[in-house]
Amino acid sequence: MTALLELCNVSRSYPSGEEQVAVLKDISLQIHAGEMVAIVGVSGSGKSTLMNILGCLDKPTSGTYRVAGRDVSTLDPDALAQLRREHFGFIFQRYHLLSHLTAAQNVEIPAVYAGIERKKRQARARELLLRLGLSDRVDYPPSQLSGGQQQRVSIARALMNGGQVILADEPTGALDSHSGEEVMAILRQLRDRGHTVIIVTHDPLIAAQAERIIEIHDGKIVHNPPAQEKKREQGVDAAVVNTAPGWRQFASSFREALSMAWLAMAANKMRTLLTMLGIIIGIASVVSIVVVGDAAKQMVLADIRAMGTNTIDIHPGKDFGDDNPQYRQALKYDDLVAIQKQPWVNSATPSVSKSLRLRYGNIDIAVNANGVSGDYFNVYGMSFREGNTFNAVQQQDRAQVVVLDANTRRQLFPNKANVVGEVVLAGNMPVIVIGVAEEKPSMYGNSNLLQVWLPYSTMSDRIMGQSWLNSITVRVKDGVDSDQAEQQLTRLLTLRHGKKDFFTWNMDSVLKTAEKTTYTLQLFLTLVAVISLVVGGIGVMNIMLVSVTERTREIGIRMAVGARASDVLQQFLIEAVLVCLVGGALGISLSMFIAFMLQLFLPGWEIGFSLTALASAFLCSTFTGILFGWLPARNAARLDPVDALARE
């Protein structure tokens, strides 16, 4: 009769300092299908090491171990996991049930790693628990079960994938006599159903219930009677659950890992929340800085555009502050006319300015008076609250009219509903108010400077007595490149003057500089926020490393029932990613709350969340989980199942 399990000259030794300590010495043993065998020996005799080798949890240092004719030494770790999953079932002295799972969920674990469909494995788990007398304890956690009930759950788990070979390590060691007798009766029933049952014990009363007793002492077998051939009942062989295809197994294990991750988070709510806190703050910082920074950037650019978009200012001299008398009269009215004829010009306005006293009744204020054309307000995109600008006839006739800004109107006419038509004194010259320019809001606040505008002809001839212009402002048509327009403008005036006695100031360059500056500042703040995200990620890695240490025994249990190293890696990696994703979602919610509060206090800001910002937050959370979860997950996957099971 061919042996199901066969060991030939198997030895197992472990390093101890510079020496090797032999635990098993030249063990040769055959166990046939359907046998009930007891391996007995005192503590330290090597019986547990022998059981670990029989269950493919450990490998011999030398010798050969075959399972159904297959040499175990030729199998890779995944093949060994499959062998444990499909052929072996473990029953431990301390039950080794996962405390955060129900009885049924504990029983299902081997089927999860076999890729069995959820409904099928749930039905089989309930069937096994019913057979073992636990139909009313299916949804109970281990803490609500007695020792005997927990051991029966452990037996059901061993049978989940068929359990052709049942390895029981001191199965009654932690039970009272009555529960112990019940467990032994179940093991005898399994033997009668065709299972091969191997019991490791030091209790001679337990060993006596086996068909064959193998005694081990100091790593050597000292008593090994021959196997007895015994006729079994027909039709009671161990039921084997067919495993699912690879893709289904992966999907099932992924869902289970996701479920386990969620249960692990729920089991330690406070620790999970504190772990997430770093991610929450990091993601909230990144998203808030991106969103609020973009709103601030748009506000800054809007303020710059309010000063005149697509505009080019022309000033006499070489640069600002140049008071050389030969350049003072460089710009003439004819230059303005020539500029207005250019096809790329939308509008152009001259400018002369002077400080004046403006009086109305007993109110006397100082203002900055600007002599401009009617196109000035179009050039700077200004609208009117009352009245309108001056027309070409008023400019030609040097009309004594004035446009006030909102601040000047409040100072001169605090109690008047309509001021158009009112007469004020500009210096000693009476002028009629024909319009009030609309106040333009700004993130920097509204200017307290008082401004008034008169026709440039009135300002030049009647007030200042000069024929030249202080500056010309040109608005370029939409779609025309402002840099090229500036070059053509420079060429035109240089040809007219015969020399370059002026300089230009392109507002687009200011806009571009502001965009670059705000982008740099936003990038810097984002990097600061990313640092907080990295700190949060390190916190996740630290807690996950602690979690791996705390759950070492759980990892050993999962490996014993058939989990591959990749399954363990996947589970802990998913846990880290899930912590970061939930933290990221809470971080986005926090950033939305921050944005909402800012919107209340800064109603002029347009704060909005783009898909790019939200997608970036999601990717950041996922990447953080993968990056900082990899090391703990790898450490978990590299654990030796024997060492993991031995830890408390």
From Swiss-Prot:
Q: Which GO terms describe its cellular component?
A: plasma membrane
Q: Which Pfam families match?
A: ABC_tran (PF00005), FtsX (PF02687), MacB_PCD (PF12704)
One GO biological-process annotation of the entry reads: response to antibiotic
Recorded topology in the membrane: Multi-pass membrane protein
Q: What class of enzyme is it?
A: translocase
Report residues binding ATP: 41-48
| Membrane spanning residue stretches | 273-293, 417-437, 523-543, 577-597, 611-631
What keywords is this UniProt entry annotated with? Antibiotic resistance, ATP-binding, Cell inner membrane, Cell membrane, Membrane, Nucleotide-binding, Translocase, Transmembrane, Transmembrane helix, Transport
Question: Which EC number(s) does the record attach to this protein?
Answer: 7.6.2.-
Kindly list the GO molecular function terms attached to this UniProt entry.
ATP binding; ATP hydrolysis activity; transmembrane transporter activity
Which compartments does it reside in? Cell inner membrane
Which segments constitute the ABC transporter domain? Answer: 5-243
According to the record's subunit comment, the protein's assembly and interactions are: Homodimer. Part of the tripartite efflux system MacAB-TolC, which is composed of an inner membrane transporter, MacB, a periplasmic membrane fusion protein, MacA, and an outer membrane component, TolC. The complex forms a large protein conduit and can translocate molecules across both the inner and outer membranes. Interacts with MacA.
Q: Its family?
A: Belongs to the ABC transporter superfamily. Macrolide exporter (TC 3.A.1.122) family.
Report the protein's function: Part of the tripartite efflux system MacAB-TolC. MacB is a non-canonical ABC transporter that contains transmembrane domains (TMD), which form a pore in the inner membrane, and an ATP-binding domain (NBD), which is responsible for energy generation. Confers resistance against macrolides.
Know the name of this protein?
Macrolide export ATP-binding/permease protein MacB
